[in-house]
Structure formats: C-alpha cells, structure tokens
Amino acid sequence: MSAGCTQLVWGGRLHWGASHLLSCLLALCALWVLAAAEPTEGGSANVQGVGEAALYQGRGQHRVPSEDNVAVLSDQWEPSSFQPSSAFSGTDLGTMVADSYRGPGNSDRRSNKELPILLWWSENLFPHFPGDAERIDCPLSSCMVTKNKSVKLHKRTKSIIFYGTDFRAYEAPLPRLPHQTWALFHEESPMNNYVLSHLPGIRLFNYTATFSRESDYPLTLQWLPTIGYLHNPALSMAEKNRWRKNGYAPVLYMQSHCDVPSDRDRYVKELMKHLEIDSYGQCMKNREHPNKRLEDTSTATTEDPEFMAFTARYKFHLAMENAICADYMTEKLWRPMHLGAIPIYRGSPSVRDWMPNNHSIIMIDDFASPKELAEFIMTLDSDDEQYLKYLEYKKPGGTTNTFLLSSMEKREWGVNDMTAPNYLNGFECFVCDKENSRIKAEKTYKKSQQGGAAPEPHIADFNHMGCPMPTPGFGSAQEIPESDSWKQMWLQDYWQSFDQGEALTAMIQRNETNQDRFWDYMHETYIKRSMNH
C-alpha cells in the first residue's frame, strides 16, 4: 500500500458488519493501488486444484509419470487425486493478532491457532492495517489472513490468494501443495495478463473474482457505484448545442494509453476521416486541452470535478476499452452515461445485458464501416429529439433493465459504501467460508464408513475470464504488415501466454520444485506443439 494510505488508515480491525468507515477507506486505498498497477493505460483426503494430476500412476508420495502422458495436452487434464498434506507444521500463528468482532451468522468460536490461514501472495494488495496478519470473522466462519509468505508451507495455510496482474507463471509457488487451493482476484484488463484468458491458466485456480459474471465472485459492475449514478442530470440540449457552436466537435476522444490489444486508435484514425472528433490525450491528439492540469488523462479515473464538467460538454464520447472480453466494462462506459453523453462503445460484446434500457448506447460493431457510423452520429447531432431518446434512462422509471437492477441489489460488496464491505475484503471472506466448508466436507468424508466418492475440487472454468485473441481495430490481420507494433506485441503475447499456462500446469503435475526450470518447460511445450503440427 502507499505511504499516504498507510497514514490515512493507521489502526483498527476489519470485520463484517462493523468498522464501515475503515473498510471504505481501505477500499479507496486498494483502488489506488489497483489503478496504479495497470500499464500506462491433495493418503488423507484433501481437495486441491490442479495439484497432482490424474496422469500419475498410483497414489503414493513417490509418483512416476505415465510414459504415455508426460506431455499433457489441455483437453486431457483431469482434477487431481487426493494426496497427503504438507508435513510442515512448526509455525505458530496464535499470537499474531487478537480476536476481532463477530460477523452476522458466524458462530465460529475457534481460537486463532485453530483457524485456517489465507495467504495474500501480492503483498501490496493485503487489505488490512497495521501489520501483516489479521483475524477475519466472515458471514459463516473465521480465518487468519496474512501477507507473510513464510507460512506458505504451513499445514493450516489452506488457500493462496493471487492478484491477476501480478501473477507470473514463472514465479508461481512450487511445489503446489495438495492441501492448498489457489484463488484469483483480477478486476483489471485482460491485457494485464493473458495467461488468465486461456484454459491452462485459469483452471489453475479454485476460486475466482474477475470482471466476468461467470466467476465465483463477480466484479462486473465494479465501475458502477449505484443505479443512481446513472441518473445524474445531463446538461441541457441548449447548453450542449452552444458548445457545438463555439467550436467543439460532437465527439470526444480522450485517451493516453495507446497501442493496446483492442487496437482502438486504428479505428479512430479511420473514423476521423469522416467525422469531427476532438482528441485531447496522447493517442491521436489533435487539440490542446484548455486546462493544462487536465492534460494528464489519469484524472479520468479519479472523477476530478473540473474534468467531469469539461467532458460533459460533449454530446458523444468514444468509449473504447483497451481489450475486448465479455463483461469487461470500465469507467469509459459508465462515466459518459453519468454525465449525460452517449457512449460510442466497443468493448464487452455482452454490454447490452447491463444497460439501463435497450436504447442508451451506440455500438460501433453495429455499423459496417466507420463511414456508416459517422453518418449516423452526424444525423443524431442535428436531431435533438432523437438524441434525447438515448438519455431516457435518466428519467423516473427510465431504467427498465431488471437484470441490471437485480444484479445491483444482490451485490454483496459496495463502491464507496460504508454499509457494505469493499470487494477485496468481500472476496477474502468468500474464500474463507469456502475453505471452512471444504475442510468440513473432507473431515466428514474421512469419518464416513460407507465409502463413496471423495469431495470434488472446485476448479475455475474458461468462462471465468477467458478472452478472445486480439483483432485489429479496423481491417483484417492479413492486411496489417508483420512489422506493425500491434501485431508483433499483442498476438505474440496472447499465444505465448497460452504456452505459459501449459508449462506451469506441467510443472505442477510433475511436482516440480525448481521455478528456474520454467523456461525448460516452455521449450518442451513449444516442441510438443510443433510436433503436433
């Protein structure tokens, strides 16, 4: 965490249902860290994730890979068998922290020494102050949480929580212990780590919190604080038209994160041939910002009042995400709607599922060409009545999407909301309750005299995040020269990330303990694919 956040939040213990102010302050600090992280722009019965795969013959501690299955393909992987727990048990966490408050519905009376431990692998994301450990009392159960990696081999360390942007296949903790699950928190862009967009990468995890509605703890609406955020009054048409007459273009583009997987600048460049667009950021800049302080477009994520007032003058905002993936929607979409501008959107293909009504955004991909889109925008720009139909969701009763309304109502976490936990604390409590349920199920299975199947591990699926290969913002990949920076960077990164997931899976399946051998496994993966082709 930043020094500023440390000074702001200097004490107290987080719990479910109390200390709401502290929780919200922590949320603000954590969001600062998350924003800064984006680039400019397992015998006893133990449930595990990938762990020891079924390719091994036998269930003893000394396993020999099957000769037929040394090179494991993605579609041949199966959940692991049960393996003994780690023998390491010397660490005593009983004195690390005192008990904190009880959460509603939590009757857990175990001492700290008896609780399962959750380890935050990304230290900067640890959502507690002060120190490096805390007891959390969640809706159903309690856990110890820590960022101290010295406990990673502890028999009570039941889950490791990773932050997606920081997760590196070549730095993953090996060997993967059979008694531990892995949890993934990733609310940021797919471009930050394409390993997670492939099945070999995402299935390494047992619990997920991502922007996808299909994840275990969805963060899809992270940029929408409340439904009321959408109902903020728009500038009058008279004022918007006045700014148009004063020389403002109908469309605003403000972006300083260039050369991204969505290749948005390539499309904007073509659109500019047919439509007047004011571009103030470093990408496609064609106009100087009247306020020098606001030239840094990082102010966009802080909702700086002057920035918001300035951008509200524009009738249309080009709202183009830096990567294309289902349910990945950011402030680029929600901010124009808050201000009363019409988003011209490209990003999540499923975005309409989340809109306040069925007539509130313009989808770039609904038009055959940039020229066709430009003609439509110019028509709306000159027709106030038709333009205002896109803002009817701001009227009383205008937000009619019951899916959006119910999703917001059921959301367990909040944004700047003192009555709800932030999503970091919410997810760790989700993992805590799941791990306590898993431990209980394993104990029941071991005590059972009737045999039967052991508890199945919960494993993430492709749709918990899986995102498609990047495609050009305009035209086809075949038309783009091989020397093009977008083609060299993002297509290569996407497919190398697939190989990294395959390599790490193979290392885990073979009980590899040496992280330095990762690139040997990468080479093996490459050779295997070459032979298959």
From Swiss-Prot:
InterPro entries: Alpha-1_3-FUT_met, Glyco_tran_10_C, Glyco_tran_10_N, Glyco_trans_10, GT10-like_C_sf. It is found in: Endoplasmic reticulum membrane. Pathway: Protein modification; protein glycosylation. One of its GO terms (biological process) is positive regulation of protein secretion. Residues 38-533 are lumenal. The keyword Phosphoprotein does not apply. It is an enzyme of class 2 (transferase). The keyword Transferase applies. Residues 1-20 are cytoplasmic. One of its GO terms (cellular component) is Golgi membrane. It is a single-pass type II membrane protein. Gene3D superfamilies: Glycosyl transferase family 10, C-terminal domain (3.40.50.11660). Keywords: Disulfide bond, Endoplasmic reticulum, Glycoprotein, Glycosyltransferase, Membrane, Signal-anchor, Transferase, Transmembrane, Transmembrane helix. Disulfide bonds join 429-432. It catalyses: L-threonyl-[protein] + GDP-beta-L-fucose = 3-O-(alpha-L-fucosyl)-L-threonyl-[protein] + GDP + H(+); L-seryl-[protein] + GDP-beta-L-fucose = 3-O-(alpha-L-fucosyl)-L-seryl-[protein] + GDP + H(+). The chain crosses the membrane at residues 21-37. SUPFAM superfamilies: UDP-Glycosyltransferase/glycogen phosphorylase. Glycans are attached at residues 148, 206, 358, 511. It holds the Pfam family Glyco_tran_10_N. Its EC number is 2.4.1.221. Protein O-fucosyltransferase that specifically catalyzes O-fucosylation of serine or threonine residues in EMI domains of target proteins. Attaches fucose through an O-glycosidic linkage. O-fucosylation of EMI domain-containing proteins may be required for facilitating protein folding and secretion. Belongs to the glycosyltransferase 10 family. This is GDP-fucose protein O-fucosyltransferase 4.
